[in-house]
Amino acid sequence: MKPKIFIDGEHGTTGLQIRARMAGRSDLELLSIPEAERRNAALREDLLNGADIAILCLPDDASREAVAMVAGNNRVRIIDTSTAHRVAPDWAYGFAEMDKAQPAKIRDARHVSNPGCYPTGAIGVIRPLRQAGILPDGYPVTVNAVSGYTGGGKQMIAQIEDENHADHISAPHFLYGLPLKHKHVPEMKMHGMLERAPIFSPSVGKFPQGMIVQVPLYLDDLAPGATLESIHAALVEHYAGQSIVEVVPLSAQLARIDATELAGKDTMKLFVFGTPGGAHVNLVALLDNLGKGASGAAVQNMDLMLSA
């Protein structure tokens, strides 16, 4: 019997991308709700409880509501793409490459929280250095990032693409999250194994999909003897044998990085920039905000759960 998959919120940006990734898969039975019925709570509850895996592509409160709808049904497993459960101790964090044991945790979990796009890049470069003892306790981490505008969902897509929108955004690039209380910071801190919350400065570019996440570091403030080469080696060791996350060879000769390079792909590239013998290093993650940063990761997690 084919596993039944229900995407609750399939008509939103992330849900549509997940649905597209499942197109043509004969190994799955996709349960669907007509767009006109998407707010029909009784129908949603029936479909949620009829699924083997429910993928929630909803705002935080609606995700909590959906989880409550299946609370008494131990057969239903959940992947939540919202921020509602990303730091919950009883949910597996769905970044399979962040730790050697993570794929098994995801495979065996009833509840999996899909990572945020920015945290995927930030944790991807920070956590290996924490585990290797290179990034010390209490280091004041900063994370700077730019995302494609689809990360803002249908509302931001309309604001940018529709010149007649009442709140049209014409700027080619803009900062947001200016009070420094972005919803992604708690998961960066927890899953990045940080003692202090990072200073996070997100921004949006006038391109649909793509993302660059940067974490600059002072070498003198890292573990004694830390170098450009030792940091790169730690990332290479951490991601050895991984097909989705690639650590690019030492990249000092690259003239630029295009935020859209991995648009439409579910992979992530990590770079280590700096001058050999210099005082600084810049860690860079490149990914698609809707790929490894959202929908691609959700499908990856679903496949891990189905392999149990």
From Swiss-Prot:
Keyword NADP tagged: yes
Reactions mediated catalytically: N-acetyl-L-glutamate 5-semialdehyde + phosphate + NADP(+) = N-acetyl-L-glutamyl 5-phosphate + NADPH + H(+)
Pathway(s): Amino-acid biosynthesis; L-arginine biosynthesis; N(2)-acetyl-L-ornithine from L-glutamate: step 3/4
Subcellular location: Cytoplasm
Major localization class: cytoplasm
Alphabetized UniProt keyword annotations: Amino-acid biosynthesis, Arginine biosynthesis, Cytoplasm, NADP, Oxidoreductase
Acetylation is among the record's keywords: no
Coiled coil ranges: none
Catalytic activity, EC: 1.2.1.38
GO CC entries: cytoplasm
Active site: 117
Top-level EC class: oxidoreductase
Listed GO MF terms: N-acetyl-gamma-glutamyl-phosphate reductase activity; NAD binding
SMART domains listed in its UniProt record: Semialdhyde_dh
GO biological process, one term: L-arginine biosynthetic process
Family to which the UniProt record says this protein belongs: Belongs to the NAGSA dehydrogenase family. Type 2 subfamily.
The protein's role, per its UniProt record: Catalyzes the NADPH-dependent reduction of N-acetyl-5-glutamyl phosphate to yield N-acetyl-L-glutamate 5-semialdehyde.
PANTHER family, alphabetized: N-ACETYL-GAMMA-GLUTAMYL-PHOSPHATE REDUCTASE, CHLOROPLASTIC-RELATED (PTHR32338:SF10), N-ACETYL-GAMMA-GLUTAMYL-PHOSPHATE REDUCTASE, CHLOROPLASTIC-RELATED-RELATED (PTHR32338)
NCBIfam families: argC_other
Protein name, per record: N-acetyl-gamma-glutamyl-phosphate reductase
Gene source species: Sinorhizobium fredii (strain NBRC 101917 / NGR234)
